Amino acid sequence: NSEVKTYLLDCPEGFTWEEGSHTHFALKGFNAGDKPNKSLVRHMSISTLPNENAIGITTRIREQCSEFKAILRNLEAGDEVALFKTHSNVPLKREDKNVYLLSSGVGLATFRPLVLEYFERADNVNQMHSLNIDSSKAFLFTDIFNTAPEKKFTAQFVDNRKDYYEEVEKLAADKDGIFYVVGSDEFLVDNIEVLRKQGIKP
């Protein structure tokens, strides 16, 4: 998908993170004035694991885009950016339950490291299921998000809301499952509503 880009940053010494982390990603000049220029800073998920030796940031850049993404689009290898306030908001929960990863579009990038972490060490996770909706049908990371019964991993991609929410309702039959949701605010609200109706509690 030509709109989706992954930027790989060299890892500064001693910089580490867990799967499911996000960071503040700042472009050059964000702190040049009296006050930080917030339009040059974005909250971004890290789409890699530390053992990949690079900090990956995956984002969708459309033709019409913000100042931030316009600058990002023109960055070249060797250009500098700043990262700060990095912390994990969705580490993989190991509670002997089934884990469901619900995402929209490029939100899937947040789950890439969780899946890799699960493949490396499946302790105390029964199985994992990913469901991603992308209306462009240009599905992401299909090398990793690929059903592998021997790893107890299933990956589903759908391109419309009807199929997506029907599938979520089916998954919600597992009242004991752990559900992760990543996408726009509207996507989160809709998913939480569907899950609650099915009796899944936060």
What are these language model-derived features?
Residues 1-77, 134:
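Ferredoxin-reductase
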Residues 58, 64-202:
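FNR/FR-type flavoprotein reductase catalytic core
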